């Protein structure tokens, strides 16, 4: 993966789920609702001055959200942050840069 470009879509890992879990409350606050399910299914990543993660998350049986999470460089010691998201996505919607 080159700096600035996004990786290929990959199946979510335990690390991806942990990153998604860290921003779940931020998304719930922005959407003003609780998600009964919050399961990371797949992701792309992008190297910047840190790393962006684009994660497809299942939030209900047939409801999906695409989230963009920023992870700063380790020496900055900052928490991961939800920087953008897209709602009303389906299981087969392609995960793209947003």
From Swiss-Prot:
GO terms for molecular function: cysteine-type endopeptidase inhibitor activity. A motif (Secondary area of contact) lies at residues 46-50. It comes from the Eukaryota. Keywords: Acetylation, Cytoplasm, Protease inhibitor, Thiol protease inhibitor. Pfam families: Cystatin. It is found in: Cytoplasm. The record marks 4 as: Reactive site. Its main location: cytoplasm. The keyword Acetylation applies. PROSITE patterns: CYSTATIN (PS00287). The modification N-acetylmethionine is found at residue 1. This is an intracellular thiol proteinase inhibitor. Able to form dimers stabilized by noncovalent forces. This is Cystatin-B. It comes from Bos taurus. The gene is CSTB.
């Amino acid at each position: 993966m080159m700096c600035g470009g996004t990786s290929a879509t990959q199946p979510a890992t335990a690390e991806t789920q942990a990153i998604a879990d860290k921003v779940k409350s931020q998304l719930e606050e922005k959407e003003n609702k609780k998600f009964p399910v919050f399961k990371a299914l797949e992701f792309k990543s992008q190297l910047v001055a840190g790393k962006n993660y684009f994660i497809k998350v299942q939030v209900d049986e047939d409801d999906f959200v695409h989230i963009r999470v920023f992870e700063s460089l380790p020496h900055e010691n900052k928490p991961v942050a939800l920087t953008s998201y897209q709602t009303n996505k389906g299981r087969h919607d392609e995960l793209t840069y947003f």
